[in-house]
């Protein structure tokens, strides 16, 4: 950014403070020489923010009222996430001398609160400590099923097939994302 004396400067606390904790459970089972199964569950908790300096930011973009004739201000903002991501994957596998077959799928869900705060502004307008300039709860669900097969027709020729069906759904509504549904 450029300071009031015209010098190019960098914000000292430009930072990314985001943490994720991951938890997983895996189960593999050999049923016979030809059959086995795999099952996994996962959960990730994420929380944190990044902070940066915005030069000449429009008051309107932050839900703030202009101060006198000023329509913009330098400010420091934080963009926060507090989210959960969880799901499962599974498959059944068959393997013989001529056929390899995998049938499986997955289901995952993301749920996250996203919000932004102005923590400092050169012209403070009517903002209060802790005010949010956007606030959103977003979700994403993703489910799929698949079948993969490889059949050995001869020593040099094999036949391969892969089918998948997938459904993905997003939902969000904020100044940052617009309406997503």
What are these regions (language model features)?
Residues 5:
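The feature captures the short pre-catalytic strand/loop hairpin that immediately precedes
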Residues 9-14:
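Active-site rim elements
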Residues 17-177:
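Face-selective signature of the C-terminal outer-membrane beta-barrel domain
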């Amino acid at each position: 950014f450029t300071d009031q004396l015209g010098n190019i400067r960098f914000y000292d606390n430009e930072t990314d403070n985001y943490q994720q904790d991951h938890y997983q459970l895996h189960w593999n089972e050999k049923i016979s020489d030809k059959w086995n199964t795999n099952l996994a569950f996962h959960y990730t908790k994420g929380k944190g923010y990044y902070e940066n300096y915005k030069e000449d930011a429009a008051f309107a973009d932050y839900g703030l009222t202009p101060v006198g004739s000023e329509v913009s201000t330098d400010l420091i903002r934080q963009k926060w996430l507090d989210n959960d991501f969880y799901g499962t994957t599974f498959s059944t596998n068959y393997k013989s001398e001529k056929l390899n077959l995998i049938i499986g799928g997955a289901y995952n869900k993301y749920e996250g609160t996203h919000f932004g705060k102005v923590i400092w502004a050169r012209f403070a307008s009517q903002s209060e400590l802790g005010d949010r300039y956007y606030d959103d709860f977003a979700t994403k669900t993703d489910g799929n099923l698949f079948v993969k097969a490889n059949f050995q027709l001869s020593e040099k020729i094999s036949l391969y097939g892969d089918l998948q069906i997938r459904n993905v759904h997003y939902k969000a509504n904020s100044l940052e994302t617009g309406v997503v549904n």
